[in-house]
Amino acid sequence: QYELVIPQKRLSKTSDDRRWRAEVYRRLDLHGELWYAELEDKRTKNVVRHELTEKYTSVSLVDFYKKAAWEGDRFVLRDRLDRETFSLPYP
């Protein structure tokens, strides 16, 4: 079975207090494209996975998830027009 997981380095960020690290991944397989984020607590090394897309899509979402930043206590993803497309609060 074909499967490719591509880490999106430009979207991976560490929080201002350096406690949290958010990593974003793009997964391609026979069903299409799926995006997810892993939020790691650097103190406990606990990792929580959050799906960015509810189901597989055949359309590329590269421009839909273009920028990332920590805004206060939220990890926020924005599209190329700077609209918020996903946000994730501290767990």
Predicted features along the sequence, with ranges:
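Structural signature of eukaryotic scaffold interfaces centered on beta-propeller domains
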Residues: 4-18, 64-71
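Acidic, small-residue rich beta-repeat scaffolds with periodic aromatic anchors
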Residues: 58-91
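Solvent-exposed strand-loop boundary residues in beta-sheet-rich modules
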Residues: 43-45, 81
